[in-house]
Amino acid sequence: MSRLTKQQILEQLKNGLIASCQPVDDGPMDSPEIVAAMAKASVIGGAAGLRIEGIDNLKAVRKVVDVPIVGIVKRDLPDSPVRITPFLQDIDDLYHAGADIIAFDGTDRVRPTTIEACARRIQELGAMSMADCSNYKEGMYCQELGVDLIGSTMSGYTGGETPDEPDVQLVRDLVASGCRVMAEGRYNTPELAAVAIENGAYAVTVGSALTRLEHIVSWFVTAIDDRKTGA
């Protein structure tokens, strides 16, 4: 398999939209064939890159697109809240399945594999790395380790109530400190995605608003229910 160089990946992603094609778990669209179709449609629509979860899904998508792919594996562990690419074997599997960028949880939480070990393994493989972080301190630490992209992915998801709006301030702060930032997390309208780029994000990832049909339909239904008259 021929691979894109780091420079080629960065050039393609600059100021671009990454479509996260992750259907609802065990839903009617949760199959590699449908994920591959989602991915192909996203690229036709102009997505600069894709974020794909799962080895089978990644293999199916890699066959039909040539844009950069951020690969992850999600797991539910009994002894750790970390879900995103928690093991070194996950990193190896993602690389061999065709991921150009391998994303892992960069939060400061109990975990089966250290952040340092994850970053080092990705570097050894020659892939690009992305750390899904929840705050400024985590992002800066991952940058010091040489991680290529710092994601705001986990902001609002490590405890307490999840805000409705994305954490644009975190993007600003990380950019101001020299990080190459992937804005991610609740960028669920075109306007919010544009705000991320305006505030210095290298690229922006959008997921549920593009590819989780169950969520999108429920947003419309809820809005209609809230405005019902004469019921």
UniProtKB/Swiss-Prot annotation:
EC id: 5.1.3.9
Any one Gene Ontology BP term: N-acetylneuraminate catabolic process
Keyword set, alphabetical order: Carbohydrate metabolism, Isomerase
Keyword Magnesium: no
Pathway in which the depicted protein is active: Amino-sugar metabolism; N-acetylneuraminate degradation; D-fructose 6-phosphate from N-acetylneuraminate: step 3/5
Stored InterPro entries: Aldolase_TIM, NanE, RibuloseP-bd_barrel
Enzyme class, UniProt record, top EC level: isomerase
GO molecular function: N-acylglucosamine-6-phosphate 2-epimerase activity
Catalytic activity: an N-acyl-D-glucosamine 6-phosphate = an N-acyl-D-mannosamine 6-phosphate
Gene Ontology terms: cellular component: cytosol
Keyword Isomerase listed: yes
Family (UniProt): Belongs to the NanE family.
Known function: Converts N-acetylmannosamine-6-phosphate (ManNAc-6-P) to N-acetylglucosamine-6-phosphate (GlcNAc-6-P).
HAMAP family (UniProt xref): ManNAc6P_epimer (MF_01235)
UniProt-recorded name of the protein: Putative N-acetylmannosamine-6-phosphate 2-epimerase
